[in-house]
């Protein structure tokens, strides 16, 4: 068995072959490499498949033997300091390796078709392979030095991938925003690593955990110092996993290609923060204040992400806020001490969210054939609707992902999310109520996305191809029904969608549909003009990953279902994670026991809340298919708008939408109070440096220059002039000497 583990070090370097070969090919044979660019998808998929097979073998060994293997090479700098590099194989390593490789392979297959017409095809696959290398190196690291190196490489890859289309200003700004925001967390991570090394004298995880715990238990180090160090480490995870308050980069990161959104923001990069907290869990157990802080950050993030996702027009940004919310569930579980539940939800969410992102990519891909390449249109749900008739496979895949994320049994996320919610009752009833309410929010915003995208009519047919609105039907309210009035662009704090003159929020929602539907649109797609009456299903290489992810979404949740209550390792996941600790169960002296009646009671309530969210979304966003239905709806609306409570509810809706549209005003707060302050300080420092610090030597230099220039013209080359000046200076010197000598004699005489 050990001979398998000893080759684990090669795992991160296998995918690295692809970017090296692509770079060498572009240098040596640039024309041939570019002409045969699609050939590079095959080695990318093949090499990552080899890593997946190796990771699968390691996972099977971990489930059967629970063997932890570590290998270290020591690089001695001097007698007092030794730098060590190595790798660690444990259950957490095997789980993350499986996630990275399985999702990575599917994304590579999907990207071959999705990026086929992009000029940066080779660059895209080089970035993807290098990103996989960085993530695999991160999860196999055995010490903080390697963690930090690969942590920064992951951040660099995310910067390159988010800004892949860097010629678009919005994409360039998004990658800079992600980079700077993550630098804040990375600086905290670096300080925490240095602080722990100062306390323990080691970078190796196993030695560091043992020494730190001993110091805390024996009161050999001040508790505040240890708490500050662990808090700084947690700051790195907050930024990388888009937790409050460093979550602001995640929605803007959707400016990258959709496969990047599936890979980075579903299974890998944003999960790196969860991985770091899980890796440091033995360290956090002895600092309960930090665990409580982690739980607090998690509960704020999951609720904030759910509220912000409820009004998003962009399909990818809505899924990004959803990712932020689900990562909050994982962080909450880790803060409560529910290690198993956090990793369980990490697994189930990765496959479900990858399915949703790739499904949204198929939707965007089909919409681009009609609206052209314009993310503002192809990703805007206002232009969508009725796609279930045109992309049925994508619709089915997206629906299953939506049901899973909403917590509907027996799909994957139901099992993991309910386990977290059950544990919140043992930790804090307030947190349990918030997490339960967020289940309803999750079902609401996910079915809102589904209904606006796939149900009803294709809304892009209600406008001309040149973008001019031909009917009021085009202006679709974000609350579900179409509105006559266009959205007011004069945004204010509480009146994003103002209602004036006692108008109803749903007043006169429809015009004459028969006069607005156009039969077809002529677009320029891939340099070939052709008639594209409706969106079309994506190619097989884009649909195949969806089908595989459907299988994962359906069956992956069963690895955490208990089947034998007599045995402690009663399910695959518990056996995989052995030994693992649930602090909540230890407090109740309830070790690894499972109460099916309690689980079913809590599950029934959570599923009921989820169905309530689905019903609410269906009520607000239910499509209207016939003209008679439009007339009936207008008649109902005529009576409803006269009710005085209607105006109050409309104001509440506008306030909620204003909050979501402005991202909770957190970005505005940062811009006004932090970014402007830092920019003003930078401008002052720049002024002081250039005008004062540089002004002193520059002023002396300029003065010397002009004095020299003046003296240069004093002498004309005549000896008589030199003698005159000599005698003049000598006379002045003698006069000064005479008066000084006279004053000295007078003072001496007076004394």
UniProtKB/Swiss-Prot annotation:
Its Enzyme Commission number(s) read 7.1.1.-
UniProt keyword annotations, A-Z:
Chloroplast, Membrane, NAD, NADP, Plastid, Plastoquinone, Quinone, Thylakoid, Translocase, Transmembrane, Transmembrane helix, Transport
Location relative to the cell: Plastid, Chloroplast thylakoid membrane
Which PANTHER family does the entry mention? NADH-UBIQUINONE OXIDOREDUCTASE CHAIN 5
Q: What is the protein's known function?
A: NDH shuttles electrons from NAD(P)H:plastoquinone, via FMN and iron-sulfur (Fe-S) centers, to quinones in the photosynthetic chain and possibly in a chloroplast respiratory chain. The immediate electron acceptor for the enzyme in this species is believed to be plastoquinone. Couples the redox reaction to proton translocation, and thus conserves the redox energy in a proton gradient.
Q: Which reaction does it catalyse?
A: a plastoquinone + NADH + (n+1) H(+)(in) = a plastoquinol + NAD(+) + n H(+)(out); a plastoquinone + NADPH + (n+1) H(+)(in) = a plastoquinol + NADP(+) + n H(+)(out)
UniProt membrane topology term = Multi-pass membrane protein
Tell me which species this is from. Answer: Fagopyrum esculentum subsp. ancestrale (Wild buckwheat)
Q: Where is the signal peptide?
A: none
**Assembly, per entry:** NDH is composed of at least 16 different subunits, 5 of which are encoded in the nucleus.
Record has Acetylation as a keyword: no
Name the record gives this protein? NAD(P)H-quinone oxidoreductase subunit 5, chloroplastic
List the Pfam families hit by this protein, alphabetically: Proton_antipo_C, Proton_antipo_M, Proton_antipo_N
Record field: transmembrane: 9-29, 40-60, 89-109, 125-145, 147-167, 185-205, 219-239, 258-278, 280-300, 327-347, 354-374, 396-416, 425-445, 543-563, 599-619, 719-739
- First-listed, main subcellular location of the protein, grouped into a coarse class: plastid
Q: Which GO terms describe its biological process?
A: ATP synthesis coupled electron transport; electron transport coupled proton transport
Query: Top EC class per UniProt?
Result: translocase
Write out the similarity annotation. Answer: Belongs to the complex I subunit 5 family.
Covalent S-S links between cysteines: none
Report which superkingdom the organism of origin falls in: Eukaryota
Annotated Gene Ontology cellular components are: chloroplast thylakoid membrane
Q: Which GO terms describe its molecular function?
A: NADH dehydrogenase (ubiquinone) activity; quinone binding
């Amino acid at each position: 068995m050990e001979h398998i583990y000893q080759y684990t070090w090669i795992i991160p370097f296998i995918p690295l072959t692809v970017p090296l070969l692509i770079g060498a090919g572009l240098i040596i044979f640039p024309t041939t490499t570019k002409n045969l660019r699609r050939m590079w998808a095959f080695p990318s998929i093949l090499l990552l498949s080899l890593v997946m097979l190796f990771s699968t073998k390691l996972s099977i060994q971990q489930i059967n033997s629970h063997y932890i293997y570590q290998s270290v090479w020591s690089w001695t700098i001097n007698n007092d300091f030794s730098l060590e590099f190595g790798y660690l194989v444990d259950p957490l390593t095997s789980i993350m390796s499986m996630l990275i490789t399985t999702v990575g392979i599917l994304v590579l297959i999907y990207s071959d078709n999705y990026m086929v017409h992009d000029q940066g095809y080779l660059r895209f696959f080089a970035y993807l392979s290098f990103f996989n290398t960085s993530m695999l190196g991160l999860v196999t690291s055995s010490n903080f030095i390697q963690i930090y190196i690969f942590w920064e490489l992951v951040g660099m890859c995310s910067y390159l991938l988010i800004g892949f289309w860097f010629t678009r200003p919005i994409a360039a700004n998004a990658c800079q925003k992600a980079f700077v925001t993550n630098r804040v967390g990375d600086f905290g991570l670096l300080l925490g690593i240095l602080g722990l090394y100062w306390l323990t004298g080691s970078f190796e995880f196993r030695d560091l955990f043992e020494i730190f715990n001993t110091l805390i238990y024996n009161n050999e180090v001040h508790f505040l110092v240890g708490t500050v160090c662990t808090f700084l480490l947690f700051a790195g995870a907050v930024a990388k996993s888009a937790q409050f308050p460093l979550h602001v980069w995640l929605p803007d990161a959707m400016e990258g290609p959709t496969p990047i959104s599936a890979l980075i923001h579903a299974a890998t990069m944003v999960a790196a923060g969860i991985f770091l907290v899980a890796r440091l869990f033995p360290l956090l157990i002895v600092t309960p204040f930090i665990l409580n802080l982690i739980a607090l950050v998690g509960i704020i993030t999951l609720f904030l992400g759910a509220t912000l996702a409820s009004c998003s027009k962009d399909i990818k940004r809505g899924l990004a806020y959803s990712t932020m919310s689900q990562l909050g569930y994982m962080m909450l579980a880790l803060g409560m001490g529910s290690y198993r539940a956090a990793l369980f939800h990490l697994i189930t969410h990765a496959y479900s969210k990858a399915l949703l992102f790739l499904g949204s990519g198929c939707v965007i891909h089909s919409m681009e054939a009609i609206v052209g390449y314009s993310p503002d249109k192809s990703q805007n749900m206002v232009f969508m609707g009725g796609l279930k008739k045109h992309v049925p496979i994508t619709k089915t895949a997206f629906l299953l992902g939506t049901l899973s994320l909403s917590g509907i049994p027996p799909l994957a996320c139901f099992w993991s999310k309910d386990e977290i919610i059950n544990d919140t009752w043992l930790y804090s009833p307030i947190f349990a109520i918030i997490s339960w309410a967020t289940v309803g929010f999750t079902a609401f915003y996910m079915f809102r996305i589904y209904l606006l995208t796939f149900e009803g009519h294709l809304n892009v047919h209600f406008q001309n191809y040149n973008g001019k609105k031909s009917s009021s039907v085009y202006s679709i309210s974000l609350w579900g029904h179409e509105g006559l009035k266009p959205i007011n662009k004069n945004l204010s704090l509480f009146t994003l969608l103002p209602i004036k003159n006692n108008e109803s929020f749903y007043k006169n929602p429809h015009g004459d549909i028969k006069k607005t539907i156009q039969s077809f649109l002529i677009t320029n797609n891939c340099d070939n003009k052709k008639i594209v009456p409706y969106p079309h299903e994506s190619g097989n290489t884009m649909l195949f990953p969806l089908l595989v992810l459907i299988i994962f979404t359906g069956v992956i949740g069963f690895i955490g279902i208990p089947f034998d209550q007599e045995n402690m390792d009663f399910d695959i996941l518990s056996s995989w994670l052995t030994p693992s600790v649930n602090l909540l169960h230890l407090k109740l002296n309830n070790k690894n026991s499972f109460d099916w009646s309690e689980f079913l009671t809590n599950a029934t309530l959570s599923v009921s809340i989820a169905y309530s969210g689905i019903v609410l979304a269906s009520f607000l966003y239910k499509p209207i298919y016939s003209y008679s239905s439009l007339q009936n709806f207008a008649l109902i609306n005529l009576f409803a708008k006269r009710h005085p409570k209607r105006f109050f509810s409309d104001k509440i809706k506008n306030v909620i939408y204003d909050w979501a549209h402005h991202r909770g005003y957190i970005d505005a707060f940062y811009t006004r109070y932090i970014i402007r302050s830092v920019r003003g300080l930078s401008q002052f420092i720049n002024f002081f440096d250039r005008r004062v610090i540089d002004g002193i030597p520059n002023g002396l230099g300029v003065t010397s220059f002009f004095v020299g220039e003046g003296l240069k013209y004093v002498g004309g080359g005549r000896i008589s002039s030199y003698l005159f000046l000599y005698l003049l200076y000598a006379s002045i010197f003698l006069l000064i000497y005479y008066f000084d000598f006279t004053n000295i004699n007078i003072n001496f005489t007076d004394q």
